[in-house]
Design a protein with these regions (language model features):
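Cyclophilin-like peptidyl-prolyl cis-trans isomerases
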Residues: 2-12, 16, 25-301
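…; additionally, a secondary subgroup of soluble metalloenzymes is captured
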Residues: 19-20
Length: 301
């Protein structure tokens, strides 16, 4: 588990939606890496898009490469070759501009990464011409991981969003963390996004560090839809803060792309944003989220 920030001797960590990468029984990697048909449902793409950065050129390369998802699934090889050629062109066009915008201590490692990306793109061109789907997918993942790593170099030095003072007593995660989840059926790895849900993610990682979830059973399972856990043994239905002897509640957090601030304890209906998609959409396979009651949005615990 990675710890990011602390304040007033309390570990500040969090969550509202987190993306899981599941490795049960170590399946064949190329099969696990097959991209989904829609980038909005690809957890890795969502995490890249959710970074609070504005690096238009690098993100253009990312999005162009992600466009190959539908093409590779449909076996549209001529279009795939053309898209890879466009990626190569964008890389050559933007490389010096992107490196120039980086902090000085990141420039040399970025230059090396760009050389590796060029090799990846050359390999993708070869794989598309050979109609080698599995090699294409594997190399594509390597390239996107490198692009995501470059994007992280552009993260701001300070947390970019305000959190209301009324939640000062709650743990928060001002960044991202990795959490290992062990189950009787195998292990899972979760990437917890505190940029877009600092209080939810912070509470989740805080409870994880306290072993709150240890030995808790899965108390709800709906096939191909959802698994639920977190109901503690005894009468309590949530986490009881030992300092107050009361159930700790975490507010509902929603971030919407291009909105300046995070919304707290307001639903899309409350905001009148009926057609908007949150930065961290819940309809993605592998998403981890907290449930609240039918009567309140601020009783996550």
């Amino acid at each position: 588990m990675q710890k990011f920030l602390s304040n007033q001797n309390k570990l500040f960590l969090i969550f509202s939606i987190i993306i899981l990468q599941v490795f049960l029984f170590k399946p064949i990697q190329v099969l696990a890496d097959l991209p989904t048909g829609n980038a909005v449902k690809d957890p890795n793409a969502i995490l890249r898009n959710a970074l609070p950065i504005k690096q238009v050129e690098l993100q253009e390369i990312q999005h162009k490469l992600e466009e190959t998802s539908d093409l590779v699934r449909g076996g549209r090889w001529p279009a795939l070759t053309k898209t890879v050629t466009k990626c190569q062109s964008l890389l050559k066009k933007y490389q010096s501009r992107i490196i120039k915008d980086l902090p000085n201590d990141k420039k040399k490692i970025a230059e090396k990464t760009f050389l590796e990306l060029k090799e990846n793109f050359d390999s993708l061109q070869d794989h598309s011409k050979a109609k080698d789907k599995y090699s294409f997918v594997s190399t594509r993942k390597e390239a996107l991981d490198k692009i995501g790593g470059l994007e992280e170099y552009f993260l701001p030095n300070q947390f970019p969003y305000d959190i209301p003072e009324e939640f000062d007593d709650l743990p928060r995660l001002l960044g991202r963390a990795k959490v290992n989840i062990k189950t009787s059926k195998g292990d899972m790895k979760a990437i917890v996004d505190g940029f877009n849900a600092p209080l939810t993610a912070g509470a989740f990682v805080d409870l994880s560090s306290k072993n709150f979830y240890k030995d808790l059973p899965i108390n709800r399972a709906e096939e191909f839809f959802v698994l639920q856990t977190g109901d503690p043994i005894g009468e309590a239905i949530g986490y009881i803060d030992p300092e107050t002897n009361k159930e700790r509640h975490v507010p509902l957090e929603i971030r919407i792309p291009d909105e300046k601030e995070t919304f707290y304890n307001q639903t899309f209906e409350d905001l009148g944003l009926y057609t908007e998609t949150p930065t961290l959409p819940f309809a993605t396979l592998g998403t981890l989220g907290w449930s609240h009651s039918n009567t309140a949005v601020d009783d996550l615990s």
